[in-house]
């Protein structure tokens, strides 16, 4: 009798594990979530190197924040901060914690993340932005003013 209860418990546990794995697998297959991850960024117009983590927000949009900067301090040891931010309350944000991307939604028809913004911490400016993949690991980021024709595109590499 005890052996039968033990066997039923093991079967129930196995079924529970299989169902959890199945649900996790289905979530991972959502094409909109492909953008989630860490990206290496080397801008051709700046000597800085950084890593940005793109994540899904609680409201279902996508955003990104710096998580690493190759040189987080100036030569004198002073930490680099978001001193150009137009919001005075954000000017003390460490360089490796700056919010770079916000408000992206996935457009399945275009296979792009659209209607977002990108922040340029060097100039303290925010631009409209869209993103798409060029291959499996290269994320194209197009920041622009007004329409995408008036902007520039960067390539970020997914780790």
What are the residue ranges of the model-derived segments?
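Bacterial N-terminal signal peptides that target proteins for export
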Residues: 2-13
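Bacterial N-terminal signal peptides
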Residues: 13-22
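Central antiparallel beta-sheet cores of small beta-barrel/beta-sandwich binding domains
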Residues: 36, 41-128
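Short aromatic-glycine motifs in intrinsically disordered, low-complexity regions
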Residues: 86, 92, 140-146
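N-terminal helix-cap/turn-to-beta initiation motif at the start of protein domains
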Residues: 27-38
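Edge beta-strand at a domain terminus
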Residues: 136-138, 144-159
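Short, compact, well-ordered microdomains
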Residues: 129, 133-139
